[in-house]
Amino acid sequence: MTLLNPYFGEFGGQYVPQILMPALKQLEEAFVSAQRDPEFQAEFIDLLKNYAGRPTALTLCRNLTAGTKTKLYLKREDLLHGGAHKTNQVLGQALLAKRMGKTEIIAETGAGQHGVASALACALLGLKCRIYMGAKDIERQSPNVFRMRLMGAEVIPVHSGSSTLKDACNEALRDWSGSYETAHYMLGTAAGPHPYPTIVREFQRMIGEETKAQMLEREGRLPDAVLACVGGGSNAIGMFADFIDDTSVGLIGVEPAGLGIETGQHGAPLKHGHVGIYFGMKAPMMQTSEGQIEESYSISAGLDFPSVGPQHAYLNSIGRAEYVSITDDEALDAFKALSRSEGIIPALESSHALAHALKMIRETPQKEQILVVNLSGRGDKDIFTVHDILKARGEI
């Protein structure tokens, strides 16, 4: 029996080998206890404020919406220590690991942002850290790999499968099944077996809470819609959670359409996948006709994931949130537009959400509306990728 509901509608659950059930039970018990412990909460809030730099700014775009009646705000998770929203929940999970008496952290990473966040939290709190990363992602995210190693983490390349995030997740789970007595698996997104989707949401929900308070202070009302990119979905559920009951606010999640949905080279399982069991949960996922997990694709390493968190699947199924997709090229255009118009270089992941916001504005330029894009991370890690693409196109 679980203490918390392991499902969101039909999605979620705990589809793991029996050997991991005691570890998940211990984790759930520690989380429930910590949520009720004022000392734990005070330490978490102190780290968020005085180490990570919360609250993050809500920035009104000055130039990007010129000639339209839209006010476009950016929730600046890119300003957080570590460079992305990932820092929020790893601090919470690292404190939970200490609470459970663990001495080691196992993590997986795609873009490297969760790896960097895990490494900094472990350095701060005195935990050993080993991070699994697809060999392909190590190539395209070398600055983040060096950051992790600089902070004392062991980065382990994964060469199996497509050598990306999916394979890193599998290796991390395999490691944990043999080491859970001393190690905590610090999952990087709001997916996987229960209680991870709930834990990650609760340790990210300050994004939406702050946004709501900042909007009321700045505009005296809530936004018409909030937008966030969706890979596994942690930054999006962090933004959405506090707005779910505010039905006047649209929730828009943006998946990667990659080279185009019709090519099959994408990472949009919510709208174009089938429900199955993967990574310890029941959720939509990209599958072959034989039912095997299909390789996902995105220009953005952090969105290159063949499934999605169960709460997003549920919000989609009941129509509370809308999920759309943006291609590599559209994300690149948004990346360039924000850099040139506002002097803010966004992560390629966040550029997907920004691209859809810009598409909405172009379609109804005279509509008076307030949109908030969760700028989940900064683009420093992506400048070499973008440079090579623009150079190949003759744009630079």
From Swiss-Prot:
The keyword tRNA-binding does not apply. The modification N6-(pyridoxal phosphate)lysine is found at K86. It is an enzyme of class 4 (lyase). It comes from the Bacteria. GO terms for cellular component: cytoplasm. Pathway: Amino-acid biosynthesis; L-tryptophan biosynthesis; L-tryptophan from chorismate: step 5/5. InterPro entries: Trp_synth_b_CS (IPR006653), Trp_synth_beta (IPR006654), Trp_synth_beta/beta-like (IPR023026), TrpB-like_PALP (IPR001926), TrpB-like_PALP_sf (IPR036052). It holds the Pfam family PALP. The beta subunit is responsible for the synthesis of L-tryptophan from indole and L-serine. Tetramer of two alpha and two beta chains. This is Tryptophan synthase beta chain. It comes from Serratia proteamaculans (strain 568).
